[in-house]
């Protein structure tokens, strides 16, 4: 059996990991200290819900953790789960923020979805949760 025959026959392991993705957290090692965590995911893709064309973006997450911290590999898999999903820029930014907040319950969180220009239009969607404290 060739590789292409095998891949047509069953779900690839990467597809399986993405479809099973759930956001994982671990205990904050310094819960009594106010600090920020900055994460950038530069290869985000989804599909335009109107044209079906691919949209590409850099997702930037900045947050002040509470009792839990987001685990990076699970975030990557979660973000990759949007690859074949038809979703607007605004909806994806709000959905991701809601899901990250539900998982980690941060003191403060901001998510920025910086989409590549298309048709001479550059869109950046910024959403936030909670009140930011000085570090």
UniProtKB/Swiss-Prot annotation:
The active site is at residues 48, 55. Keywords: Cytoplasm, NADP, Oxidoreductase, Queuosine biosynthesis. It is an enzyme of class 1 (oxidoreductase). Pathway: tRNA modification; tRNA-queuosine biosynthesis. It is found in: Cytoplasm. Substrate binds at residues 70-72, 89-90. It catalyses: 7-aminomethyl-7-carbaguanine + 2 NADP(+) = 7-cyano-7-deazaguanine + 2 NADPH + 3 H(+). Its main location: cytoplasm. Its EC number is 1.7.1.13. It comes from the Bacteria. One of its GO terms (biological process) is queuosine biosynthetic process. GO terms for molecular function: preQ1 synthase activity. GO terms for cellular component: cytoplasm. It holds the Pfam family QueF. Catalyzes the NADPH-dependent reduction of 7-cyano-7-deazaguanine (preQ0) to 7-aminomethyl-7-deazaguanine (preQ1). NCBIfam families: QueF-II (TIGR03139). HAMAP family: QueF_type1. Belongs to the GTP cyclohydrolase I family. QueF type 1 subfamily. This is NADPH-dependent 7-cyano-7-deazaguanine reductase. The gene is queF.
């Amino acid at each position: 059996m060739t590789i292409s025959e095998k891949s047509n026959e069953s779900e690839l392991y990467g597809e399986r990991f993405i479809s099973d993705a759930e956001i994982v957290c671990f205990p904050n090692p310094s819960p009594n200290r106010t600090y920020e965590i900055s994460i950038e995911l530069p290869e985000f893709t989804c599909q335009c819900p109107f044209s079906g064309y691919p949209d590409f973006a850099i997702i930037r997450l900045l947050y002040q953790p509470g009792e839990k911290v987001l685990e990076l590999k699970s975030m990557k898999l979660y973000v990759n789960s949007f690859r074949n999903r038809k979703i607007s820029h605004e909806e994806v930014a709000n959905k991701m923020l809601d899901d990250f907040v539900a998982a980690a319950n941060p003191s403060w969180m901001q998510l920025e979805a910086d989409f590549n220009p298309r048709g001479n239009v550059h869109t950046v969607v910024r959403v936030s949760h909670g009140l930011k404290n000085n570090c």
